[in-house]
Structure formats: C-alpha cells, structure tokens
Amino acid sequence: MDTRRLRGNPPIGRFRRPRRISMAPQPQKPRIVMKFGGTSVGDVERIRAVAKRVKREVDAGAEVAVVVSAMAGTTNQLVDWVRDTSRFHDAREYDAVVASGEQVTSGLAALALQEIGVSARSWQGWQVPIVTDDAHGKARIARIDTAEIEKRFQQGMVAVVSGFQGLGPDNRITTLGRGGSDTTAVALAAALKADRCDIFTDVDGVYTTDPRIVAKARKLDKITYEEMLEMASLGAKVLQIR
C-alpha cells in the first residue's frame, strides 16, 4: 500500500489509535421512603422540622419520597363532621372527605421543603396513582405506578405523597383504614425498590405497650418478626398487620 503523505493529510494506510472512553456505570443514589405520622406533622413548626430532617437526606445524596399522615386530630374531626352531616353516609363521599387531611399536610410539607431550598412537589394518592380495590374505608393496594415519581427523582425533586389513600376502580378516592399511611409508605418503598423505609414516630423504639398511656411499659431491645406480627395482630400500633 502506498503510504506517501498527501499535503495536509495523515499518511495513507496509517490509523490513529482510538481514544478509550470510560463506560463505568455511575454510582446509584440511595433511595429512601420517609413516613411521618400525625404527631410529627401536628403543626406548622413540626412540619418545618420534618422538612429539615428530609433535607439532610437530600444533602447526603439520596432520592427521597416522603409519606405523610394528616395533622394530629384532623382525621377524627373530619369523621365527626361526616357523621354530623349524615347518619347513613355514602362510603365514597366519606372517603373523599376523610382523605382531605393528608392532602393539606402533603401540600404544607412540600411548601416547607421549597422554603429551605429543596425542590419538592406533593402528590395525592390518585395522582401517583396508588391503585386500590373498591373496598371504601378499608381498601387494599393493588399496584403503584411510580413512573412519574421516578421521573421527578431524575430532576432532583423530593416527592411528598399523601398517605392513607388511593384510587379505586370506579375512579373515586379510597382510604386504606387504620394505619393506612404506614401501609402507603411500605408499599411505595417496595414499588420504588427503595433501599430503606423509615417510619418516624414520637416513641423512641418498640415497647411492650404504649408508653404514653402505661408508665411501666418496657422498651424491647430485640424482637423477632413473628413476635412483631403477633403484637400487630393483637392491636399494637408499632406495625401495620396488612
């Protein structure tokens, strides 16, 4: 092959060695679901404290979804209003009213995060959507479509999700029953393939009974899954049996 140089060109028959481009995968960000109950979000000051706690995880590089309950006492007030209005209430309208407490909390939490420089937006259960069966007042989650939340994670945004609620097959709001916000958090963590699900309460561990009621309640250093499930089946609020 003639390898004589042509003016302005490299020698014919010679090839430059290609540059090596690193194709190493980027490290995956940890993904966390954080659930805050009614006492933790009981007023605006506590919601601000929650926002600061979430910001610490965001600053550490995590993708965060927050699940919130209604502010303490709100759901009971909503239930009372329903019963005062109608003795024989429609279960679908009952759910529409009772689920509104979480809507307020999620919006306030998103605003509190934005106030301290964290990109965030709120989602109601039907917006995600969290799809349930049609058992109003005690619905079970069938599936969660996480596509929109995951897209927002890519934009560096925190997702604040209203717990305790979903979307039934009749396109109506459903509620999940007692402990429904815990159920939302665990189900969302599973759907997002989260690294962990943190459930925040105003009690610093697992006790033999509620220490806020029984002064002699004993804190348990260790507990098996079987013991935890038995406690939940007997009514303990530390774990949602569903």
Across the structure, where does each feature detected by a protein language model lie?
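Nucleotide/pyrophosphate-binding catalytic subdomain
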Residues: 19-242
